[in-house]
Amino acid sequence: MIDNKLKKFILKEANDRCKGTLVSTLDINFTDVGETFLVAEMHVTPKLHQPAGVLHGGATAALAETVGSSAAAIFSKKEDQMLRGVELSINHVRGISEGTVIAKAEPIHMGRTM
């Protein structure tokens, strides 16, 4: 279990690292971290809408890529390697025009390097 002090440190570092990037432009914020998971939230406003008035799929993809890649970087056991996403598949179940969307990244398998 990650203690509160370490949790706050990891979340602050993750959010600070994203300042001035697409992540901050989309108002994505990391909100929770545990031993093997990372959570981020994105507040849906009209600036994130597609012309039909619902959340743009690209914004959803950016949220998923952000939380997945950030989790990989945080939990990597190799400090000399930079991890990045390789493939992304998004299925939209329902549209949303306002509120908050939440993404949680959890590994399927933690090996020697991850």
PLM regions and their residue ranges:
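Terminal targeting signals and extreme-terminal segments of soluble enzymes
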Residues: 1-114
